[in-house]
Amino acid sequence: MARSLVCLGVIILLSAFSGPGVRGGPMPKLADRKLCADQECSHPISMAVALQDYMAPDCRFLTIHRGQVVYVFSKLKGRGRLFWGGSVQGDYYGDLAARLGYFPSSIVREDQTLKPGKVDVKTDKWDFYCQ
């Protein structure tokens, strides 16, 4: 009986950590459109500084610490307008590219505009895909 309860507890714990955010795959879209500096959203729109810490709720988002520099590559429109897409400066290892993700626009202060973010781009499933 005790062994069954332990096994049940382990199964419950494992299932709590194996949700879609951990496993990978498509996640719900935050928005249907976004503003970028170019059609591919490959150039940063601006540089911003984090005003507070932000813990990513799932793999679509970035964990950001107060004072970190954030490169903003996109600004979601419509229902997702409160979120921007970008990467954190120094968030890379060796030859690996920095990870892109979303964060609330309210936690950063834009300090420098690099390129106007006026190109309206349709989002696709890859914009919200977890690896």
UniProtKB/Swiss-Prot annotation:
Cell compartment(s), UniProt: Secreted
Signal peptide: 1-24
Keyword Disulfide bond carried by entry: yes
Organs and tissues of expression: All malignant melanoma cell lines tested and infrequently in glioma cell lines.
Intrachain disulfide bonds: C36-C41, C59-C130
GO molecular function list: growth factor activity
Entry's Gene Ontology BP terms: extracellular matrix organization
Top-level taxon: Eukaryota
Post-translational modification: May possess two intramolecular disulfide bonds.
Domain (SH3) ranges: 43-113
Subunit structure: Interacts with FASLG. Interacts with TMIGD2.
Family of this protein: Belongs to the MIA/OTOR family.
Family matches, as PANTHER family: MELANOMA-DERIVED GROWTH REGULATORY PROTEIN (PTHR47312:SF1)
Protein name: Melanoma-derived growth regulatory protein
Gene assigned in the entry: MIA
